[in-house]
Structures are given as C-alpha cells and as structure tokens.
Amino acid sequence: MSEQMNEDALVDSKKFVSRRGGFEINANPEIVPPVQRTRVRVEKSADGFAHEPLAKKYGSAEARTKIGEMVKAFIPGTTTTPLLVQKKPDGMSLVHVWFGANFPLFRHSHPKFGDCLYYVVAGEILMGNQTLRAGSTFFVPNGQPYKYTAGPAGVELLEFRAGGGVVDAPGMKLDETSFESMDRIIAGSYANDADWQVPERIGDTALRQADFDGRLSKI
C-alpha cells in the first residue's frame, strides 16, 4: 500500500516543475571524509584561491607557499558534503559542512556563488564576540568576507544558496591580509588537530557538544 502511494506521489510530482528543477530526493547521505595532509600538494593549493592582494604585498611565489602551508595545516579539520546541487540558473544548493574542535576558519568570501544562509546544526562557532549554537543562523551577502572559529566540540552547519552570484568572479577568495594572520591559523590548526574527529553521521556533533556541556547523561 505505502509502496503504491510512494509511486503515485512520484508520478504526481512530475506535474510540478520549478524553473530550478523537478522533485528530487537525496536520501541518507554519508559525510565525505576529510582530505589528509599527505595528499596536499603545497605548490598547487593556491590555485583554489583568488589572492592578488597577498601576492602584491609579499610576492607571488611567497604568497602561494604560505597558502599551501595554511591549507596543509587545516585540511584534516574540515569536510564538505553536497546534499543538493541544482545547476540551472538560480538553482538552489544545500551543503553540509563540518569543522573540528577549535578550527580557525580563515577570512574568505565566495563572490561567484551568491548570497548564503548558514544554519548551525550542532556544536557552536565563535564569530566576533558572539557564540552561535545549534539553531542559530547567519546570512552572508554575496562577496562579503567572513571568518569564525569552531567551538570546543566542533561544529556542523548547513549552507543554503539560491544562485545570484557573479559568473566570472572567484569561487573562493582569500581575504586574510597578512602572513601573520595566516601563521596564527596554521599554529591553531596544528595545536587542535588531535581533537578533530569527523562525525559518523550528520548531526553527531550534538553528542560531543552535550558531553562537553555535561548534559550527555541527561539525554
């Protein structure tokens, strides 16, 4: 009975098509494993970042090397899992992002991809003088630089986009302005990497946060 109802629902959904696409399901996705440091090619890492101000300030080769060092330092503490990607104009995207304990996210922006709404699923982040815990949201207008630090249990976020970016703009723009600030990110990454434990399932960071808060025995 329920199987027939599901088939009927799928058939019926074909009548309703948005300019962004048709009915779509991505069921029970697994978290993409983090990249390990041994796989990082330091000399190539800078290719993924627009970084003209740093290159102008320090020289191209020096800037590329520093970016590579930063990427190698932080890479095992984060992972991105696509949940929905619509490639049509103004298509929506939904991405799950995890950062490990006390992960120092670098200042950056995504001018190519449009406005972005973030939802904290589990754990917490420190943004400026605010602590954003599960259920919190923040909206980043297209091209605005931002950074934050993950809390002591790490953090999981959902990243919502609905198009509207600048086609020829960089997908990832590094907005750190000095090697000193990047060195702090590098040092912070190596200082905390022993506590970077990627969750097995989306939302599992909530258990680590509850344990850290002393609430686990009450759950």
Regions found by a protein language model. Name each.
Residues 90, 131-134, 142-172:
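Ligand-binding loop in jelly-roll beta-barrel domains
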Residues 122-123:
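Glycine-centered positions in the ABC transporter ATPase nucleotide-binding domain
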Residues 64-66, 72-111, 126, 131, ...:
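Conserved short histidine dyad/triad with adjacent acidic residue
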